[in-house]
């Protein structure tokens, strides 16, 4: 019960922050300068994305089961909004292993789309598929992180549909999905905004204290 209470508390903190809009204390503009590296990725990802780097996601990415990805402060993860393949499947971030987003108040992690697409018109456009933690994801930390412009329609060919997480044609991606009832998740000090669907869809799990 203590773990569940902590998880609910963390989720409520996220939703409260998400409602703050432009007055939000977590400002992605803080990590626009001093970038050390730019990398384009798709497929399997693991290891560490170093502080203040820019990660351009050109296709679906997956943290494999048994592996971990750590994202340091100030990293900008920019998703291609054109989608994958003929169906333009929204680019999806699947976490079969573990994910640790370690932003700071001054230098948060950012999951977004290209800056020119961060417009009022695209507020509910669902430009990418969000973070989907599968039933093999044991731990996920999302701290001082901004997640925005998610919620694309689940269509045929999407990893979430292929893995049975969502139904193609009937569902839209939440910004964060968890599936492991034994998983440990902390989502705190973060902003979920400009999403077409739910902010967080939790299927059980425990909080990491």
Could you say what each language-model-derived stretch is?
Residues 1-8:
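Bacterial N-terminal signal peptides that target proteins for export
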Residues 16-19:
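C-terminal motif of bacterial Sec signal peptides marking the signal peptidase cleavage site
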Residues 21-209:
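Beta-strand/loop edge motif enriched in small/polar residues
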């Amino acid at each position: 019960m203590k773990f569940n209470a902590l998880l609910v508390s963390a989720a409520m903190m996220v939703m409260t922050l998400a409602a703050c809009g432009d007055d939000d204390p977590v400002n992605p503009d803080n990590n626009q300068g001093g970038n050390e590296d730019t990398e384009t990725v798709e497929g399997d990802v693991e290891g560490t994305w170093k502080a203040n780097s820019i990660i351009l996601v050109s296709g679906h990415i997956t943290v494999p089961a048994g592996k971990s990805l750590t994202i340091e402060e100030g990293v900008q993860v920019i998703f291609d909004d054109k989608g994958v393949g003929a169906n333009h499947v929204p680019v999806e971030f699947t976490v079969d292993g573990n994910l640790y987003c370690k932003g700071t108040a001054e230098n948060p992690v950012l999951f977004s789309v290209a800056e020119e697409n961060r417009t009022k018109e695209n507020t509910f456009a669902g430009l990418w598929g969000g973070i989907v933690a599968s039933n093999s994801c044991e731990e996920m930390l999302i701290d001082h992180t901004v997640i925005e412009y998610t919620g694309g329609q689940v269509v045929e060919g999407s990893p979430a549909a292929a893995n049975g997480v969502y139904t193609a044609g009937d569902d839209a991606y939440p910004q964060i999905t968890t599936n492991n009832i034994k998983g440990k998740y902390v989502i705190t000090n973060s902003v979920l905004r400009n999403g077409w669907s739910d902010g967080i869809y939790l299927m059980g799990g425990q909080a990491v204290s």
